[in-house]
Regions:
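A short glycine-rich, aromatic-capped structural motif
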Residues: 34-214, 220-240, 338
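Intrinsic disorder/low-complexity segments enriched in polar/small residues
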Residues: 7-8, 12, 133, 295-297
Length: 364
């Protein structure tokens, strides 16, 4: 399954870049009796020309088009929203509070201490005794605004581990070695960088977005921004575990996902963005034009210098737009061009299309 996470909070000039969380082959889903997430759509396998579009002659000098085949997967219909990502942040916050109050410290992991969520969600943070135990999670007194006691966002650390299958595959005796030899442990601060609004827009008044964009409910259905690649990976890991936790809790173990949520590869993202188009057009809607016949913009981007409206009276998306604000593509995916940049699992390498494989290609 694939989750789409956003990297930057600004409009791009129709750049096809994405963050997708976790793809699973369709065969795996059937074997697991998987109930598809209502926010996801099934992308059928197929072949397409990966690389520059026909109109991008200058790009052909760097990355040539290459015919590749992609196996089927599921993908989020929209970018991951502020509301969805806040659930991840709240999970980390609540679990750390539980470890601090009931397990003797936040450095414990859920591998050794299981969080009792009935108790975790009832922790009284107004109690002086509780505040004393939470001290290692709180802002230091000299960093508090008007003396308000709050959680330090930099201390919201998510700890997880995974098996490095690539490392195991490189070893000639990978199957004979203990699993611990290939077990990788990671820690990642999960709170997004809200200062990206200030950093990416020089000489521009964006303080309100820095203060409110991630936390205010008015932006619930806007794409989360300021998320690093490592934070996106951590979110994918949490989403997999969280989904399986609720299936376990509901005694639906036979429906657990036979796979993981993850970021998409660049090839998967581009294949999904093109929306089954055979014309190799530049844009996901299958034409070389950026407007409808009525003059409406087909994506959230900057039409011209100093012009964020594009003479479109109904376009009020000066910055990011709410998910599903623009038409979906043939695969029923939204914002596969414009709005904000998205992460993939692949590493960018100039000329990479010249040597990647032609079956589910990836470069890491």
């Amino acid at each position: 399954m694939i989750t789409r996470l956003k990297k930057l909070p600004f409009k791009l000039p129709l750049v096809l870049v994405a963050i997708i969380l976790g793809s699973i082959s369709m065969l795996s889903f059937k074997a697991a009796k998987f109930r598809s997430d209502p926010y996801m759509v099934q992308i059928p396998g197929g072949s397409f020309y990966m690389g520059p579009s026909d109109e991008q002659v200058d790009m052909a000098m760097v990355n040539r088009k290459k015919l590749v085949s992609i196996t089927g997967f599921w993908m989020d219909r929209t970018e991951v929203t502020n509301q969805q990502y806040r659930k991840f942040v709240k999970y980390v916050s609540d679990s750390l509070k539980y470890l601090a109050v009931y397990a003797g410290g936040v450095n414990q992991t859920e591998d050794t201490v299981k969080v009792d969520w009935n108790r975790a969600l009832r922790i009284n943070t107004n109690s002086k005794a509780v505040i004393e135990k939470l001290n290692e999670l709180l802002l230091s007194p000299d960093n508090r605004i008007q003396g308000k006691v709050e959680i330090d966002p930099t201390k919201l650390i998510y700890r997880y581990s995974y098996v490095d299958l690539k490392a195991a595959a490189k070893s000639s005796k990978g199957l004979e070695q203990p699993l611990s030899n290939f077990l990788v442990s990671q820690t990642e601060a999960v709170y997004p960088d809200s200062l990206v609004w200030m950093r990416d827009f020089s000489y521009s008044y964006n303080e309100p977005f820095t203060r409110l964009y991630f936390s205010h409910p008015s932006y619930n259905h806007y794409p989360v921004v300021g998320v690093t690649w490592k934070q996106a990976i951590a979110f994918c890991h949490w989403r997999t575990n969280n989904s399986n936790f609720y299936l376990d809790k509901g005694n639906k173990k036979d429906e657990k996902i036979d796979g993981i949520y993850r970021l998409p590869t660049e090839a998967e993202w581009e294949y999904a963005a093109r929306g089954n188009s055979k014309t190799n057009n530049m844009y996901p809607w299958g034409s070389p034009y950026t407007r409808t016949k009525e003059g409406r913009l087909l994506a959230n981007f900057k039409p011209g210098r100093g012009d964020y409206f594009g003479s479109d009276a109904k376009n009020d998306n000066i910055y990011t737009s709410k998910v599903q604000s623009y038409p979906e593509n043939a695969y029923k995916l939204f914002d596969m061009a414009g709005n904000v940049a998205e992460w993939t699992s692949s590493v960018y390498y100039e000329g990479g299309n010249n040597f990647i494989g032609d079956f589910s290609p990836d470069l890491q």
